[in-house]
C-alpha cells in the first residue's frame, strides 16, 4: 500500500491519525470489537416469497469479516461506519476540506476530486461523469436524477449511498442494509 510505505504506518493507523480522529468519526473502523458487534445493523435479502428477510451471516449477511482484529486493510472496501459519522466526512468535503477546525484536504484538492475527469468515457450521453472517487452529476435532466450540476457521490455494499450537493449546501447518507441492492432506485 502506497500510504503505508510513505507514512510508515499501517493503513488503519494512518486513517485514524489523519482523518477519523481529527473528524471525530468515533464509530468508523475496519472491524468491530465484541462489545460493538451488537450495534451492527442487520442485513436483509430478497426471499423466495417476493419479500425481504434478515440475511444469514454468510456471504449475504455481515459475516465474519466485520470481526477483528486483522492486519490487512483495503483502501476501497471494508470500512464500517454509521450514517452520522459518514455525514461528518461528507460535510468536510462540502466545506472544502475542513470540519470543526480540522483541515483534512486543501480546497483545491476537493475541487480536483469532484470534477469530471473522464469526459464521456464514464457516461456516453454526458449526463454524469467521474471525478477522483465520485460520480459527478453534469446534467440532472438527462441523468434522470434530482440534484444540482456538480453534485457528487457514490454507493457501496448493502445499498449504501451518499451524495454531496454543494449548490444546495446539502449532504445525504443512506444506509439501506439490503443485499443485493439491485432494483432500488435511489
Where are the model-predicted features located?
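Generic C-terminus detector
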Residues: 179-186
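Short, well-ordered beta-strand micro-motif
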Residues: 135-136, 163-165
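Short, surface-exposed loop or secondary-structure junction motifs
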Residues: 1-149
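Short, structured beta-strand/loop micro-motifs enriched in basic residues and often containing a Trp
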Residues: 153
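Short, small/polar residue-rich loop motifs at catalytic or cofactor-binding pockets
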Residues: 156-158
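Active-site-proximal flexible loops/turns
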Residues: 89, 172, 184
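Short, well-ordered beta-strand elements
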Residues: 162-163, 169-178
